[in-house]
């Protein structure tokens, strides 16, 4: 059985580590000077969406700017992920990525709108998702 409190605690610790790094880089520039969009490539209401909303609330307070959760579901996460790739690489559009979308989809779909290695720069780890194939 999944212990939600344990998962939430791990997410919050990761969030703390992530925001510490962002805060030090923000001190060197005026970033962020506007709202940040956090794209979730899945429908609202799931674990990924809930995690994104918790993260956005806490990071928004920490950074002093609003974080907007933008759900872009479809094609096993490829639609939202592709939109992040096409966004300006200015740090104001972030992706809450998932192993399935970034690692498995390139091997399952013939034409995906991104290259996981070339198009993304990891910022931090939020949690783990256990995938079992039978």
PLM features: residue spans?
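Bacterial N-terminal signal peptides
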Residues: 9-20
């Amino acid at each position: 059985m999944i212990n939600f409190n344990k998962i939430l605690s791990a997410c919050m610790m990761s969030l703390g580590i992530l925001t510490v790094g962002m805060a030090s880089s923000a001190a060197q520039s005026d970033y962020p000077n506007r709202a940040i969009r956090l794209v979730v490539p899945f429908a609202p209401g799931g674990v990924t969406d809930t995690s994104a909303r918790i993260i956005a609330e806490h990071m928004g307070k920490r950074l002093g700017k609003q974080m907007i959760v933008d759900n872009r579901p479809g094609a096993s996460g490829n639609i939202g992920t592709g939109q992040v790739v096409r966004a300006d690489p200015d740090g104001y559009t972030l992706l809450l990525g998932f192993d399935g979308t970034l690692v498995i989809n390139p091997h399952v779909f013939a034409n995906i709108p991104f290259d996981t290695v070339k198009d993304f720069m990891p910022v931090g780890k939020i949690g783990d998702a256990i995938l079992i194939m039978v």
